[in-house]
UniProtKB/Swiss-Prot annotation:
Subunit relationships: Homodimer.
Superkingdom field: Viruses
Protein's recorded name: Suppressor of RNA silencing p3
Compartments it resides in: Host cytoplasm
The organism of origin for this protein: Rice stripe virus (isolate T)
Result after altering K165G: No effect on RNA-binding or suppression of RNA-mediated gene silencing
Organismal lineage: Viruses, Riboviria, Orthornavirae, Negarnaviricota, Polyploviricotina
């Protein structure tokens, strides 16, 4: 598979994928099947409608080679959707789309899993999934001594710990689960006591994280 770009001459047609990347033409050859600028712009329009966060620059980088398996997977799903559900797909775009699907699926042997999101608050605040103190939590007394205690890592694997204070289950639905350790009961009824006997055992061969 080869990606061809050009910034010389007149632009083939007015489309943001070309204009925003300062290109006059863009095409891909997949096993001797030519995918034109118009076909790629058509695919971009559908992919961006399904994934609004992707812009023209990101899509061009994607065409040259996806950075991670999640990005690649979403792009392949778009190509499959076009082939299976798009009633407006021009017939001349069908074969290029098929060949692109066949070519891009091979990237799975090269891409790496996406690293954990740096937007996860618990991942940023907790070192090695250890409890950490917070100045306040809505629904608890302002003078309470509070800790956030992770009970699973970012991938959902349970975290074992040793705790000396009462734990309360957080109503948070976030992926990285945690409970709240407090020396005073909560003021809000939405927090309930959390008891997990397996989590109160120390890790073999390691020192427990004591609050």
């Amino acid at each position: 598979m080869n990606v061809f770009t050009s910034s010389v001459g007149s632009v083939e047609f007015d489309h943001p994928l070309l204009l925003e990347n300062d290109l006059t033409s863009l095409s891909i050859n997949c096993d001797d099947v030519h995918c034109s600028s118009r076909a790629l712009c058509y695919i971009y329009d559908i992919h961006s409608s399904r994934h609004p966060s992707i812009d023209e620059h990101q899509f061009l980088r994607l065409l040259h080679g996806p950075d991670d398996a999640v990005t690649l997977g979403s792009f392949l799903k778009t190509l499959i959707w076009i082939l299976s559900h798009d009633k407006n797909l021009p017939e001349e775009y069908r074969l290029p789309t098929i060949m692109m699907s066949s070519s891009y699926v091979k990237f799975f042997t090269e891409v790496k899993p996406r690293p954990p999101s740096t937007n996860c608050w618990t991942c940023r605040m907790s070192k090695d999934n250890l409890p950490f103190t917070v100045p306040s939590v809505k629904g608890f007394p302002p003078d309470a001594e509070l800790y956030i205690v992770p009970i699973s890592d970012h991938d959902g694997k349970p975290v074992k710990f040793d705790n000396r204070k009462t734990l309360y289950r957080s109503p948070s639905k976030k992926r990285h689960k945690y409970v709240i350790s407090s020396d005073k009961p909560p003021l809000s009824a939405r927090y309930v006591k959390y008891v997990d006997s397996s989590a109160l055992e120390s890790l073999p061969g390691s020192s427990p994280a004591v609050l």
